[in-house]
């Protein structure tokens, strides 16, 4: 503990790291003293002692800035007192001692340690590194258009919860998607199926040749499909011209799905027109198999629902984060299929009633056995084959069970991130007695917003920051007047 001389020294002069002016006659002696000067930090009764130069490595933090830490100084005990979590401070002090390495103690929960990082003002960079070390996926920031009108249109179509009209557009979009999927399914019913697939066939009636054609343009299913495509095309074009980056627009998988959803209609329309012209000349323009494959692509419209469903978004994020585990699962299954299909083939080779004519023919049996489906269309009949089948089923259960916990853990992370963000959006969390600096407030006003939750918080500031009184500090999916980017993370407002 450092003892300062002078009985009538004020509080600032008695604080560690704040010597009274003129107390050191020579600058060299002052530097040597400050280099070795120690400071005592009391964390809820547990005292820590370190050198001032250790804290001075990070002057923008609470402990590294003499002015910021002064309000916690106790002149009677000549120490700084913080009524904070004691186990967490071991890691906080190590952050200063190691030059920026942050490690969470195993007995401290994630949320509590995050609060300590915010309280000691270690900075956004330290928080991001901590989240990455803990396995959190780095949040993606999306820029917004610079023009106000373009920005409003983009928010209207991209963020359904940003306003009432945006919700209406989202509801209309979901209804159109559902109608399109229902039409896709209903048109295959035999009682509703048209004979348009047989366009161009020739029927002989009373020794006369008649070319039978069906007009697709009068088909009710085609009319409803056309209305759906008009909406999909309008939505896609508006979002394309309103997006802040045309390159990023085409890189987005959801926009690619939107394009794929409307392409089959225009291809089908072109082929139908070509076939009608071909029928007039007595020839068929397009193969029915090609048309059926093109129509099959329409089923991908169901993925458009993921734009409006948090559950599907969570599932997609889980699969994306679990690609390594899924790759290992497929690799293990591949090895098992090769191994057990070969084993069962040679085990059943001498059996006349064997269902396995070759090793590739046994691939199907190995897959359904390892996945414990067991259709029963192929099965071993010898003792050796049954032993191989038993081992195949056991190996399949173990292989599938290995990566499942990691995938479930990823799902829980994304699910709780969504639900916790909804809870945080209902509260204004105060984690520090310090008001934000001008630079922090201006940085926040440039703002990052969450993609899922919206909340508008209006804080009445005191007279010292009256120029911020009229500012609306928004977190969640709300925007400010000078907002330039969108952050998909969940935010807490610290005042």
Swiss-Prot record:
The alphabetical list of record keywords is: Cell junction, Cell membrane, Cell projection, Cytoplasmic vesicle, Endoplasmic reticulum, Glycoprotein, Ion channel, Ion transport, Lipoprotein, Membrane, Palmitate, Phosphoprotein, Potassium, Potassium channel, Potassium transport, Synapse, Transmembrane, Transmembrane helix, Transport, Voltage-gated channel
User: For this UniProt entry, what's an example GO CC term?
Assistant: axon initial segment
The effect of disrupting this gene, in the record's words, is: Mice are born at the expected Mendelian rate. After three weeks, mice begin to display episodic eye blinking, twitching of whiskers, forlimb padding, arrested motion and a hyperstartle response. About 50% of the homozygotes die between the third and the fifth week after birth. Surviving mice continue to display spontaneous seizures occurring once or twice every hour throughout adult life. The fecundity of homozygotes is extremely low.
**Where would I find glycosylation on this chain?**
207
- Residue ranges for motif PDZ-binding? 493-495
Task: List the S-palmitoyl cysteine lipid attachment residues.
Answer: 243
- Motif residue range(s): Selectivity filter: 372-377
Q: In which tissues is it expressed?
A: Detected in brain. Expressed in cerebellar cortex basket cell terminals, the area surround the Purkinje cell soma, and the pinceaux expansions encircling the axon initial segment (at protein level). Detected in the juxtaparanodal regions of the nodes of Ranvier in myelinated axons. Detected in the paranodal region in sciatic nerve. Detected on cell bodies in cerebellum, dorsal and ventral cochlear nucleus, pontine reticular nucleus, mesencephalic trigeminal nucleus, motor trigeminal nucleus and the pricipal sensory trigeminal nucleus.
Subcellular location per UniProt equals: Cell membrane; Cell projection, Axon; Membrane; Perikaryon
Residue spans that sit within the membrane without traversing it, per the record = 360-371, 372-379
Q: Which residues lie on this side of the membrane: Cytoplasmic?
A: 1-164, 243-253, 309-323, 416-495
**Top-level taxon in the UniProt lineage:** Eukaryota
Q: Which GO terms describe its molecular function?
A: delayed rectifier potassium channel activity; disordered domain specific binding
Membrane topology per the entry is: Multi-pass membrane protein
One Pfam family name from the record?
Ion_trans
- Tagged with keyword ATP-binding: no
Q: How does it assemble?
A: Homotetramer and heterotetramer with other channel-forming alpha subunits, such as KCNA2, KCNA4, KCNA5, KCNA6 and KCNA7. Channel activity is regulated by interaction with the beta subunits KCNAB1 and KCNAB2. Identified in a complex with KCNA2 and KCNAB2. Interacts (via C-terminus) with the PDZ domains of DLG1, DLG2 and DLG4. Interacts with LGI1 within a complex containing LGI1, KCNA4 and KCNAB1. Interacts (via N-terminus) with STX1A; this promotes channel inactivation. Interacts (via N-terminus) with the heterodimer formed by GNB1 and GNG2; this promotes channel inactivation.
Question: What note about domains is in the entry?
Answer: The cytoplasmic N-terminus is important for tetramerization and for interaction with the beta subunits that promote rapid channel closure. The transmembrane segment S4 functions as a voltage-sensor and is characterized by a series of positively charged amino acids at every third position. Channel opening and closing is effected by a conformation change that affects the position and orientation of the voltage-sensor paddle formed by S3 and S4 within the membrane. A transmembrane electric field that is positive inside would push the positively charged S4 segment outwards, thereby opening the pore, while a field that is negative inside would pull the S4 segment inwards and close the pore.
**Job of this protein:** Voltage-gated potassium channel that mediates transmembrane potassium transport in excitable membranes, primarily in the brain and the central nervous system, but also in the kidney. Contributes to the regulation of the membrane potential and nerve signaling, and prevents neuronal hyperexcitability. Forms tetrameric potassium-selective channels through which potassium ions pass in accordance with their electrochemical gradient. The channel alternates between opened and closed conformations in response to the voltage difference across the membrane.
Q: What is this protein called?
A: Potassium voltage-gated channel subfamily A member 1
- Report the source organism: Mus musculus (Mouse)
Instruction: Please spell out the taxonomic lineage of the organism that makes this protein.
Output: Eukaryota, Metazoa, Chordata, Craniata, Vertebrata
The gene is Kcna1
């Amino acid at each position: 503990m450092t003892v300062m001389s002078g009985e009538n020294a004020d509080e600032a002069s008695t604080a560690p790291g704040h010597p009274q002016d003129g107390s050191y006659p020579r600058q060299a002696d002052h530097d040597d003293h400050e280099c070795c000067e120690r400071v005592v930090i009391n964390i809820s009764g547990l005292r820590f002692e370190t050198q001032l130069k250790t804290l001075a490595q990070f002057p923008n933090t609470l402990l590294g800035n003499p002015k910021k830490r002064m309000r916690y100084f106790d002149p009677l005990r000549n120490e700084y007192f913080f009524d904070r979590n004691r186990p967490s401070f071991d890691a906080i002090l190590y952050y200063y001692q190691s030059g920026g390495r942050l490690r969470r103690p195993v007995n401290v929960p994630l949320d509590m340690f995050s609060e300590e990082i915010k309280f000691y003002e270690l900075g956004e960079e330290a928080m991001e590194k901590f989240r990455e070390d803990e396995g959190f996926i780095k949040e993606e920031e999306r820029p917004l258009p610079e023009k106000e009108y373009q920005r409003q249109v983009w928010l209207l179509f991209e963020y359904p919860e940003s306003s009432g009209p945006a919700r209406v557009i989202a509801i209309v979009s979901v209804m159109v998607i559902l109608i399109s999927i229902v039409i896709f399914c209903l048109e295959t019913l035999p009682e509703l199926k048209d004979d348009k697939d047989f366009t161009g066939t020739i029927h002989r009636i009373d020794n006369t040749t008649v070319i039978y054609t069906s007009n697709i343009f009068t088909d009710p299913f085609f009319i409803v499909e056309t209305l759906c495509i008009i909406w999909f095309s309008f939505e896609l074009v508006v979002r394309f011209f309103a997006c802040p980056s045309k390159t990023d627009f085409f890189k987005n998988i959801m926009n690619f799905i939107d394009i794929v959803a409307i392409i089959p209609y225009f291809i089908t329309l072109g082929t139908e027109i070509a076939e009608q012209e071909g029928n007039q000349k007595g020839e068929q323009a397009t193969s029915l198999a090609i048309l059926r494959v093109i129509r099959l692509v329409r089923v991908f419209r169901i993925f458009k629902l993921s734009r409006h469903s948090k559950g599907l978004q969570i599932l997609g994020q889980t699969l994306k984060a679990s690609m390594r585990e899924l790759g290992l699962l497929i690799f293990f299954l591949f090895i098992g299929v090769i191994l057990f299909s070969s084993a069962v083939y040679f085990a059943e080779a001498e059996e006349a009633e064997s269902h396995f004519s070759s090793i590739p023919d046994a691939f199907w049996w190995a897959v359904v056995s390892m996945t414990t489906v067991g259709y029963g269309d192929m099965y071993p009949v010898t003792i050796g084959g049954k032993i191989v089948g038993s081992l195949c089923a056991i190996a399949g259960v173990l292989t599938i069970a290995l990566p499942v916990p990691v995938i479930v853990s990823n799902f829980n992370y994304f699910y709780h991130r969504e639900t916790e963000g909804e809870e945080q959006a209902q509260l204004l969390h105060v984690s520090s007695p310090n008001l934000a600096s001008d630079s922090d407030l201006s940085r926040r006003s440039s703002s990052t917003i969450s993609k899922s939750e919206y909340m508008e918080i209006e804080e009445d500031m005191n007279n010292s920051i009256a120029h911020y009184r009229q500012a609306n500090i928004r977190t969640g999916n709300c925007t400010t007047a000078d907002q330039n980017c969108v952050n998909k993370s969940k935010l807490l407002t610290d005042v």
